[in-house]
């Protein structure tokens, strides 16, 4: 969003630009923009999305320069470990020391961490996760906008409030409405990355969805993620050719039997094959599972993290199960906040270097302090809902969603204030 800074193009070679943020070099694909050394750009997800005038870039960089390094100092102090960050639990201390050295945790070690009950030890795990986040990713925090274009869905998932059996009022935004909402997010609030989300077989044909993506790419400088469920390999290719470069598709559980029980008529293998095909096609992958899903064990949760990593996820998306009154799982409890933080921090410990970990809206719905606690437990990504208010409450996947009645402006102000207070800075998602 507006939490972005321009980069200087230092070199362009075979469609890949070397770009510099205050002297720190990264690389980004430049397939959408023709570049020369000396140009200034905005990049997201490892893609250059916009070339900007030097005067505009230099003005922004001047405003950011001192702030950029001050934020890093704030974050480094808050993420540092000290002499109090030790445990009398010798096995835990050994596991955390191994994690700090970059040694991959075994499944048994991961299960031990998830089974911790002592509050001090739980806090120590979270602080270690935050330390590793800072060591590998510095203070970068990515912010995406999410635009929910339709709540129509043919799936009948046992936990979802917009499943085909739900009595929720259905909507499908028109192309003009989508363009207007995206235009406000991009032009007024400076978003550089948008997730387009809907139910599966959401009232648009694949051709119509591809036209939406192409229309947005032709008009706006933005990285587009799609989240339309399983649309098939042909559909993925059509969306990619239209300009989408990211896919948000969660598998929810790595347990095949539990998956089939909760997703009637569907198989986990189909989901995984879809994600693998998207990665091979060039998509940035965002995936993960539900925490506290009825019937899931700690063993399943560890397998969820392992599977997410094996799918080459650019971003891990793990959120709590939240019961919806109109679903088969209405009477099951949500997990505790500690359960959620335990999984987020374990994901950081297990995948410290590559994981970008999202603080989901579901977690924000579970806890008003989700962003703060999640970002201090290894998380480094948030989302802002840019869906028009008249539709937002109808995307009722679980009750009383966070930010359901907030304007985009209100959400942006809150997000910026919170990120700056934690010393988090803007980032390009690519490596």
Residue locations for each model-derived region?
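Auxiliary Fe-S-binding modules of radical SAM enzymes
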Residues: 4-5, 9, 14-27, 35-36, ...
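Structural motif
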Residues: 39-40
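Short, charged beta-turn/beta-strand-edge "cap" motif at the junction between a beta-strand
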Residues: 45-51, 55
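Conserved, mostly hydrophobic/aromatic
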Residues: 102, 129, 157, 249, ...
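N-terminal pre-triad scaffold of radical SAM enzymes
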Residues: 124-166, 170-193, 197
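Glycine-rich, proline-tolerant flexible connector loops at the mouths of alpha/beta enzymes
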Residues: 146-147, 194-206, 257-259, 320-332, ...
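Core AdoMet radical
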Residues: 163-179, 185-207, 212-275, 284-291, ...
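Catalytic cores of alpha/beta
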Residues: 232-239, 294-308, 365-376
């Amino acid at each position: 969003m507006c939490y972005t800074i321009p980069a200087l193009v230092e070199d362009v070679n075979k469609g890949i630009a070397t770009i510099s943020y205050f002297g720190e070099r990264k690389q980004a694909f430049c397939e959408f923009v023709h570049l020369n050394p000396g140009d200034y750009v905005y990049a997201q997800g490892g893609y250059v999305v916009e070339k900007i005038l030097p005067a505009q870039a230099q003005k922004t960089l001047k405003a950011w320069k001192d702030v950029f390094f001050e934020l890093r100092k704030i974050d480094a102090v808050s993420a540092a470990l000290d002499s109090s960050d030790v445990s009398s639990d010798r096995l835990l201390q050994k596991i955390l020391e191994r994690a700090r050295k970059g040694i991959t945790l075994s499944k048994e070690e991961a299960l031990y961490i998830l089974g911790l009950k002592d509050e001090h030890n739980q806090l120590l795990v979270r602080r270690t996760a935050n330390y590793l986040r800072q060591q590998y990713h510095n203070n970068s925090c990515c912010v995406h906008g999410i635009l929910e274009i339709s709540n129509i869905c043919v799936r009948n998932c046992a936990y979802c409030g917009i499943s085909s059996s739900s009595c929720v009022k259905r909507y499908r935004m028109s192309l003009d409405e989508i363009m207007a909402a995206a235009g406000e997010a991009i032009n007024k609030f400076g978003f550089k990355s948008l997730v387009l989300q809907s139910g599966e077989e959401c009232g648009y044909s694949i051709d119509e969805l591809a036209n939406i993506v192409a229309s947005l790419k032709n008009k706006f400088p933005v990285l587009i993620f799609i989240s339309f469920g399983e649309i098939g390999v042909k559909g993925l290719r059509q969306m990619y050719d239209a300009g989408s470069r990211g896919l948000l598709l969660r598998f929810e559980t790595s347990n095949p039997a539990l998956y089939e029980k909760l997703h009637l008529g569907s198989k986990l293998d189909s989901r995984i094959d879809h994600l693998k095909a998207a990665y091979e096609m060039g998509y940035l992958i965002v995936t993960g599972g539900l925490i506290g899903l009825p019937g899931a064990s700690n063993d399943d949760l560890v397998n969820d993290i392992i599977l997410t990593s094996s799918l080459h996820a650019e971003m891990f998306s793990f959120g709590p199960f939240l019961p919806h009154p109109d679903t088969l799982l209405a009477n099951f409890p949500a997990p505790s906040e500690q359960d959620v933080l335990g999984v987020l921090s374990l994901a950081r410990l297990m995948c410290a270097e590559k994981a970008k970990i999202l603080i989901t809206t579901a977690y924000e719905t579970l806890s008003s302090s989700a962003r703060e606690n999640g970002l201090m437990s290894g998380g480094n990504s948030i989302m802002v809902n840019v869906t028009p208010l008249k539709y937002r409450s109808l995307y009722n996947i679980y009750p009383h969603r966070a930010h359901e009645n907030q304007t985009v402006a209100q959400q942006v102000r809150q997000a910026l204030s919170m990120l700056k207070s934690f010393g988090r800075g803007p980032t390009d998602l690519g490596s």
